[in-house]
């Protein structure tokens, strides 16, 4: 069976796809994120496995129409929800080229050019971190893999025999630390590494939602006294819920004092390194032993494009290197085999999209993007401060805003967590109902919030104003009273327009 087509058919199908992609990109400034609520019907696909083929042009047209017309479009400029960006067009071209060439990055002898491009991209970003001497690292599928790999490196660094002999050789329970707001991939990693999820010590946060360093040090002392083995502290640069950035210099001092590995999860926030104006927000990141960074967040890369960066190439190699008799070993003095510096084995070339975008647009394009999105978020914050309905529930550090409704008609002392959670979920449901825009719910330091963020490079002031108008309209339609018209209630009753719909309950964060 020949899966190829003749040149004429290949060109026809390629042009057909390019036409769809071009129309899609051209529509993104005003394209709705998803169909309206009444049209979101997604029955299971029940067709049988095809025994014979169909016309490729018809099949391609059908799936393009289905995905574009009925899909959920995170590239839309109106997508103001999670950390999912509008991809650059150069990234789309890079992904197409990689799919065609299919380089295998496990072994250097079969990926010399691809591996050189990847190593160069790693070096570029590592130098932005502040590591001028031999920054090393590898592309990953995202922050989950990068954090898992960093914890494996930390174990290898602190307990050199653990990779060969296992956790039992340590002789005591290894423990590591992160804030209550740190990413939940750390819990998953603790389980996958065999540490057990209880090995992750979640430390409370301060008023700025940063890891509380006093309580961190107290927890370390307590664990040492009980015979446990602290091996890593994870500082977060840009939490998912609020964008908070931990105090990296102070955490580094604690790491130095107790000889503990410092990992910075900068999956989102480390992108500020591309901005001279804002890189100070992650001051001290150069002191980290390893860094997680996801270009598929703020750098507008399509999935998957994660990075694990380190200033300890020897520990990276010690953690992941294995002898493999059926693969040729990379010659001494050249680049390492990627399988020996990564949790992955066979893998695609995830670096080309970032490399190509940087070659075409340069660092300064990202600097302009980051600076502009910070200005949009700051303007949004000022609107919230003057809003009749909302207030900020957390400091705005990066282009993420946490909104708390204050115009409920319920006295603050009687507005419990459940009521607030349901009201917020109802507002989100109302804002998202027509499909034009999309925002999300979150829980920040145990409190329900409405979460919005600026992530698309296409988002402008007009998109923010549209969201603001929609938020106000949602409050009005739900019967919420503006602060100037608030009437105290005797009992915490739900506003008249708030319905306990299944969607609202589903969207409500835990109270």
Where on the chain are the PLM-derived regions?
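Short loop-beta-helix segment that forms the pyridoxal 5′-phosphate
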Residues: 125-153, 201-204
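Short Gly/Ser/Thr- and Asp/Glu-enriched loop/turn motifs at secondary-structure junctions
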Residues: 133-134, 394-399, 443-449
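Conserved PLP-binding catalytic core of the aspartate aminotransferase-like
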Residues: 391-431
